[in-house]
From Swiss-Prot:
CC cofactor: Mg(2+); K(+)
Name recorded for this polypeptide: S-adenosylmethionine synthase
Subunit: Homotetramer; dimer of dimers.
The protein's role, per its UniProt record: Catalyzes the formation of S-adenosylmethionine (AdoMet) from methionine and ATP. The overall synthetic reaction is composed of two sequential steps, AdoMet formation and the subsequent tripolyphosphate hydrolysis which occurs prior to release of AdoMet from the enzyme.
């Protein structure tokens, strides 16, 4: 009899209260960077029934209309009158300038704060991401798109998913064990109808895309039986509370720092992107099948305090050689990261990353997903 171990990841939709906050924070960041690429932004959002509070520290030469940004984003996500939360809500702005004590360290190219950041890659999907996270995300991408196109008319914006995979004794995915989907809905739709549509029209097509069997899966669709009250009317939302959803679904470690609302001088964001970039190129170069990078920084210091490579026993060459190659190939200073990953260029919108995840995106050309260092890594290791 086969022995299995189990691993689970979850995901939440753009209409989840915490994700509303993340997207508003990043929409404000995008607005600042659009007209002033050197803006310093640390923006936090709190949303609840009938109210959005925007706070933080912003130093910029441009003007941003906070209320307009908030209302447009709520409309875009899909909240309408009658849902307990919509763009007619009150908006309170409590923003002031960045502390000069922080600015003096960042101005010379140093990190905006101390901290540890992680990034990883694993050979489970084409984009070298953990499969459980990818499946959880794909389910909600499909469900959200079907809601917005009115293909599923009863669905509302607040949605969650969770996928459990069974791994064999060799650490390979054997099958999907269980799937949880909770979707906010209108008053009139029955639980049986919701369950049928979610399984047949949303989940099964996603599984087919990845050549996974839908047989014998344990499904939990709206397991409480009712999910009418949702969004910020059901739960308060705050920026930065979905950091595992934003990254690897718990498959790799996380340093604890959130991304949204932070300009690229904040290494919580920029260095986490860089760690993914490094790890993905290592795996793509076939130096390992699985890789996790840890970076650490000190406030005001231009270079990382430490760089750690962990290949979990899957490396094809000595880990020390990989570490040496990383130090030769990648400039992991805050300014080096900003330049290499085009973090102030405006080629992508941070608010789009806040909606469906910052890592492993295939629908957006994010520089940290590019495999542009594979040959240099191989050359550095003399393969």
């Amino acid at each position: 009899m086969k022995k299995f171990t189990y691993f689970t990841s979850e995901f939440v939709s753009p209409g989840h209260p915490d994700k509303i906050s993340d997207q508003i924070s990043d929409a404000i960041l995008d607005a600042c960077l659009k007209d002033d690429p050197n803006s310093r932004v640390a923006c936090e959002v709190f949303c609840t029934t009938g109210l959005v509070v925007v706070g933080g520290e912003i130093t910029t030469s441009t003007y941003i209309d906070v209320q307009d940004i908030v209302r447009k984003k709520i409309d875009e996500i899909g909240y309408r009158p009658g849902m307990g939360f919509d763009s007619n809500c009150g908006t309170l702005s409590c923003i002031h300038a960045q502390s000069p004590d922080i600015a003096m360290g960042v101005d010379i190219g140093g990190a905006g704060d101390q901290g540890i950041m992680f990034g990883g890659a694993v050979r489970e999907t084409e984009e070298l991401m953990p499969l459980a996270l990818v499946l959880s995300r794909e389910i909600l991408v499909k469900l959200t798109n079907m809601m917005k196109s009115n293909e599923i008319e009863w669905a509302r914006p607040d949605q969650k998913s969770q996928v459990t995979l069974a791994y064999d004794e060799n650490g390979k995915v054997d099958h999907v064990d269980s799937i949880v989907v909770s979707v906010q809905h209108d008053e009139d739709t029955t639980h049986d109808e919701i369950e049928k549509i979610v399984i047949e029209k949303v989940v099964k097509p996603v599984l087919e895309k990845y050549n996974l069997s839908s047989d014998n899966i344990k499904y939990y669709i709206n397991p409480t039986g009712r999910f009418v009250i949702g969004g910020p009317h059901g739960d308060t939302g705050v920026t930065g509370r979905k950091i595992i959803v934003d990254t690897y679904g718990g498959y790799f470690k996380h340093g604890g720092g959130a991304f949204s609302g932070k300009d690229p001088s904040k290494v919580d964001r920029s260095a986490a992107y860089a760690a993914r970039w490094v790890a993905k190129n290592i795996v793509a170069a076939e130096l390992a099948d699985k890789c996790e990078i840890q970076l650490s920084y000190a406030i005001g210091v231009p270079k990382p305090v430490s760089v750690k490579v962990d290949t979990f026993g899957t490396s094809k060459v000595d880990e020390d050689k990989i570490s040496e190659a990383v130090s030769k190939v990648f400039d992991l200073s805050p300014r080096g990261i900003e330049k290499a990953l085009e973090l102030r260029e405006g080629n992508f919108k941070y608010q789009d990353l806040a909606a469906f995840g910052h890592i492993g995106r295939t629908d957006i050309d994010t520089p940290w997903e590019r495999l542009n260092k594979v040959d240099e890594l191989k050359k550095a290791i003399e393969l």
